[in-house]
């Protein structure tokens, strides 16, 4: 009410500003927009200290970038957009959303043109969705089709005298096999092969539909621009400066110095001006606020009192406090969780699930799986009203696992002995020295199966399925692509994030919504942690040591899928 009264008081001034916008737009409007698709997107914002220290500009948020593309599609008279495509460092979830946005521009009759100096499969997929495609005559592309080559340390562990005991809830929960074996078990291997096959099928469909490029061409490890031009994939070969400087000319070639451009340039300032002009209303009325909250990284076992955000990690206290604030803020009408987590601590997964359920009781909460919601990530999603994703999202891994390292033989090789004093039943579980008693083994198996049963109950409640159906086809640690999971009823749709926001707007029965991205702050602690020298073992998939030196308790039950995170990239 107060806002409406203020808008009435200042209405004459606001109308005057709107008049100037109309005049300025008449001068600034153009029919061509030049835009760089960045190589990375941010999930957090940098603190002032980090910005000063690093000095680099932050990468944009994916959501902001997509909303910008949507705004471009509404500009009257816009005929063409030239995209400078950097080689993507993000996952197929981001790429698919960008491809959908480019498709939407094409459908609106806006000609999209792309230029890429080089890159891999993702760069080619983005380029493929543009109507005109360009590269330098010197450009080379290095495509890699869906495949996997994981490390196995079973032989090394045996030589060192390290025993690895895995207690898994199903044959497909292959988390411990990396350390126990020299290859995957047949069930786990078959599941991964099926997922990779589905990924290839999606890529094949994407390339054929957008540009007609046969996926078999991408089996060649090096593709020159000359070859892609002969195949008809590239429209022409241009140097980068030609594309950057001559984008107002139809063919990106300026015949003469005084040649008249074919297009009129629309600058970012002009786009912002048009958006303000378009969104002007005589009366300022409140619109529903929709929060998009990124949930990014492994779910940590930390239950300390510290509430600070941790970059690329899901910490309990930070999200507990965030969910509480969202729950209690009357201005917020709905929440979308942007999920990118392979899981982690079973205990923290359950605690955060309960916090999400509390939030869901107050307002609509939806999960959007960008790249991965496996194990604990999917567990969290089950606390929301709906679960959506992309066809490329890696989902599932419904089950539990626990690892225990037995170091006695290694210690003895090094001349180290440990003596057990005052041990009681099951105390050996907390020791890495010696094998477990039969009773302790049975205890751990029961704990893992109990955690699995709780997980199953969360899924069956959220997705209205039976435990029998879940275990027979979709549980026991299996991983799937989003499209497969959607057909089985475990995702509500495979949609772009913009389509999900449109659905939220319709569900709220609102003409407009105010979409706000709510990232955490990457502060000096995160920066120093990232700068620490040491073993960065992400590439080796070592489960108890991540890039930030935060360890899982080896006696803790995990809802975690290490392979899912890799496959999503």
Task: Identify the meaning behind each predicted range.
Residues 284-331, 519-569:
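Intrinsic disorder and flexible/low-complexity segments
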Residues 160, 199, 203-211, 225, ...:
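C-terminal long alpha-helix characteristic of the crotonase
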Residues 8-11, 29-61, 288-315:
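STAS-typified acidic loop motif
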Residues 84-225, 341-482, 506-507:
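Conserved catalytic cores of soluble enzyme domains
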């Amino acid at each position: 009410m107060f806002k409406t009264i203020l808008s009435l008081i200042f209405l004459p001034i606001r109308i005057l500003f709107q008049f100037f916008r109309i005049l300025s737009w008449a001068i600034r409007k153009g029919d061509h927009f030049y835009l760089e698709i960045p190589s990375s997107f941010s999930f957090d914002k940098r603190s002032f200290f980090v910005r000063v220290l690093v000095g680099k500009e932050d990468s944009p948020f994916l959501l902001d970038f997509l909303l910008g593309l949507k705004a471009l599609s509404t500009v009257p008279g816009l005929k063409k957009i030239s995209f400078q495509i950097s080689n993507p460092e993000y996952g197929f979830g981001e790429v698919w959303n960008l491809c959908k946005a480019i498709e939407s521009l094409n459908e609106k009759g806006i000609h999209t043109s792309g230029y890429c100096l080089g890159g891999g499969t993702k760069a080619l997929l983005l380029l493929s969705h543009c109507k005109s495609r360009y590269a330098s005559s010197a450009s080379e592309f290095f495509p890699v089709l869906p495949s996997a080559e994981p490390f196995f340390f079973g032989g090394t562990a045996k030589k060192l005298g390290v025993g690895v005991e895995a207690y898994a809830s199903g044959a497909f929960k292959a988390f411990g096999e990396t350390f126990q074996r020299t290859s995957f078990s047949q069930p786990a291997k078959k599941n991964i092969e099926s997922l990779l096959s589905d990924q290839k099928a999606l890529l094949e469909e994407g390339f054929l539909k957008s540009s007609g490029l046969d996926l078999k061409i991408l089996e060649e490890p090096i593709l020159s621009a000359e070859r892609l031009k002969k195949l008809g994939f590239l429209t022409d070969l241009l140097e980068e400066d030609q594309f950057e400087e001559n984008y107002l000319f139809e063919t990106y070639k300026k015949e003469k110095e005084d040649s008249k451009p074919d297009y009129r340039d629309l600058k970012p300032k002009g786009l912002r001006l048009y958006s303000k002009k378009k969104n002007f209303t005589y009366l300022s009325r409140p619109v529903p606020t929709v929060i998009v909250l990124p949930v990014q990284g492994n779910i940590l076992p930390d239950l300390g009192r510290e509430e600070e955000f941790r970059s690329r990690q899901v910490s309990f206290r930070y999200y507990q406090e965030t969910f509480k604030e969202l729950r209690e803020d009357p201005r917020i009408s709905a929440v979308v969780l942007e999920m990118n987590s392979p899981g982690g601590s079973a205990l923290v997964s359950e605690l955060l699930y309960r916090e999400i359920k509390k939030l869901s009781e107050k307002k609509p909460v939806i999960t959007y799986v960008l790249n991965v919601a496996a194990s604990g990530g999917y567990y969290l999603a089950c606390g929301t009203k709906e679960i959506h994703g992309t066809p490329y999202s890696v989902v599932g891994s419904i089950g539990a696992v626990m690892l225990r390292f037995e170091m006695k033989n290694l210690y003895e090789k090094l001349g180290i002995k440990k003596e057990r004093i005052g041990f009681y039943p099951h105390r050996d579980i907390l020791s890495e020295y010696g094998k477990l008693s039969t009773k302790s083994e049975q205890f751990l198996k029961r704990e893992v199966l109990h955690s699995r049963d709780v997980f199953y109950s969360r899924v069956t409640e959220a997705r209205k399925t039976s435990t029998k159906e879940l275990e027979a086809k979709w549980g026991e640690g299996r991983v799937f692509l989003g499209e497969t999971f959607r057909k089985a009823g475990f995702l509500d749709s495979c949609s772009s994030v913009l389509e999900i926001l449109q659905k939220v707007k319709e569900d709220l029965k609102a003409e407009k919504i105010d979409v706000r991205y709510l990232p955490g702050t990457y502060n000096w602690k995160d920066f120093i942690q990232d700068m620490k020298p040491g073993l960065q073992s992400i590439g080796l998939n070592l489960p108890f040591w991540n890039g930030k030196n935060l360890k899982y308790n080896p006696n803790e039950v995990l809802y975690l899928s290490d392979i899912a995170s890799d496959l999503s990239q």
